[in-house]
């Protein structure tokens, strides 16, 4: 989609499990442009780009005093304004730009609407990290991935014959809501899996590694204190649905 003289908007993602997971191609583009705008950029990656002569403008302050939805809208508008008035604009955020990233998906849609030339550099997404972590042979067994809130909205989407990865688990529970907000999700899972089905909570701690806790579906409540913004829930139908004690592992 890029024009001969280069794209007006460039989207790139840094890794979901390591701050330095930024592809060589994305780094080369950042050096070529000489400046980037970024959201949630870790200090190690900012320092790396600075050593390469890239000026980094963080947009995190646009969230100050605003609800998250308004903050995301402000970030998107700031990126689009640069792409339109002072291109090229390169925006770096966590994960793969077109997977589990509402801002970058919106930016792609707006770039197409405004007929802005665009280039996207994929990043290491949470799905990539988890597939590698738990050793899923996606080509053989398949893998159903959907956000927890998306599953609640489309109950018929659940396929108990394939391993299930529920993304954005914390999104089921609005800020300030009680743990009872997870009730409908648990009931939906109980309708498809036995009470003894092992389920694994996976939290991505960035540079701190990945933590896992496995319990039976009947004991979902034991996972509640550990659910955070990075949490995903994995249901591995390859494992026999038998009662087991909670296990924890940190890599």
Feature names for model-found ranges:
Residues 1-20, 24-121, 223, 231-232:
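Class I S-adenosyl-L-methionine
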Residues 2-12, 117-251:
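Beta-strand/loop-alpha-helix module characteristic of Rossmann-like adenine-cofactor folds
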């Amino acid at each position: 989609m890029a024009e001969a003289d280069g794209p007006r908007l460039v989207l790139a993602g840094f890794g979901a499990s390591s701050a330095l997971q930024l592809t060589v191609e994305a780094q080369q583009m950042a050096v070529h442009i000489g400046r980037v705008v970024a959201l949630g950029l870790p200090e190690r990656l900012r320092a790396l780009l600075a050593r390469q002569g890239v000026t980094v403008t963080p947009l995190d302050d646009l969230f100050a005093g605003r609800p998250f939805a308004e903050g995301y809208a402000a970030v998107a508008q700031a990126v689009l304004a640069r792409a339109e008035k002072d291109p090229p604009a390169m925006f770096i955020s966590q994960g793969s730009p077109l997977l589990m990233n509402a801002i970058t998906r919106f930016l792609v849609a707006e770039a197409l609407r405004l007929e802005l030339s665009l280039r996207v550099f994929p990043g290491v997404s949470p799905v990539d990290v988890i597939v590698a972590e738990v050793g899923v042979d996606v080509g053989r067994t398949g893998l159903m991935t959907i956000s927890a809130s998306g599953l609640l909205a489309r109950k018929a989407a659940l396929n108990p014959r394939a391993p299930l990865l529920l993304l954005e688990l914390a999104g089921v529970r609005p800020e300030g809501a009680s743990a009872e907000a997870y009730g409908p999700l648990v009931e939906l899972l109980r309708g498809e899996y036995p009470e003894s089905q092992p389920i694994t909570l996976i939290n991505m701690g960035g540079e701190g590694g990945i933590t896992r806790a496995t319990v039976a579906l009947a004991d979902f409540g034991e996972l509640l204190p550990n659910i955070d913004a990075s949490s995903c829930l994995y249901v591995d139908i390859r494992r026999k649905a038998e009662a087991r004690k909670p296990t924890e592992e940190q890599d």
